C-alpha cells in the first residue's frame, strides 16, 4: 500500500530577493526555495539588498526579509524597496516577537509575517500564498 501523500506546495518560477543576516538560515532558505523552482537573489543585509535591487534589471516578485538585522531593519528596507518597486510583495520573518518594529509590522494588516523558527513547508506555503495574493500583501 502506498504511503499517504503530503500536501504539496506549488512550484514557483518567480524571483525572490532574500535578506537574512544569519548565514545558516539564509542557506536553508535558499536551498529550500531553489528546490521549489524560485530564483533567489541572496543578500545578508539591507544595504546589500538595496544595491542588488538597483542592479537587477528583471522583475523581483517578492522581498523575503528578516526584520531584526545589523544596520537597517527589514521594515526600513521594505519601505525603500516598495518606493522603488511599487509592485513588490513582502514577507517579513522574525523570532523577536517582543521587538517594537515587529509589533509595528504586526499592527498593519497589509503586512504578512512568518514567525521564526518555522518549518520548511510553512515557509514554502507562505511564500506561495503571498505571491498569489494582492500586491498590498
Where are these predicted regions, by residue range?
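Charged docking surfaces used in two-component/phosphorelay signaling
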Residues: 27-35
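Active-site residues of response regulator receiver
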Residues: 66, 94
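The feature encodes the CheY-like receiver
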Residues: 26, 70-71, 98
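Disordered, acidic interdomain junction associated with two-component signaling
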Residues: 1-17, 104
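Active-site beta3 strand of CheY-like receiver
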Residues: 57-64
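Short hydrophobic/Thr-rich beta-strand motif most characteristic of the beta2 strand and flanking loop
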Residues: 37-44, 52, 114
Amino acid at each position: 500500500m502506498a504511503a499517504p501523500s503530503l500536501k504539496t506546495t506549488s512550484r514557483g518560477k518567480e524571483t525572490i530577493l532574500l535578506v537574512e543576516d544569519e548565514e545558516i538560515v539564509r542557506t536553508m532558505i535558499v536551498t529550500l526555495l531553489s528546490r521549489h523552482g524560485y530564483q533567489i537573489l541572496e543578500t545578508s543585509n539591507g544595504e546589500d539588498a538595496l544595491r542588488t535591487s538597483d542592479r537587477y534589471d528583471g522583475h523581483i516578485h517578492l522581498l523575503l526579509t528578516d526584520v531584526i538585522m545589523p544596520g537597517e531593519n527589514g521594515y526600513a528596507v521594505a519601505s525603500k524597496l516598495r518606493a522603488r518597486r511599487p509592485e513588490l510583495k513582502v514577507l517579513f520573518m522574525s523570532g523577536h516577537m517582543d521587538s517594537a518594529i515587529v509589533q509595528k509590522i504586526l499592527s498593519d494588516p497589509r503586512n504578512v509575517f512568518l514567525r521564526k523558527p518555522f518549518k520548511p513547508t510553512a515557509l514554502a506555503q507562505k511564500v506561495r500564498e503571498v505571491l498569489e495574493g494582492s500586491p498590498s500583501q
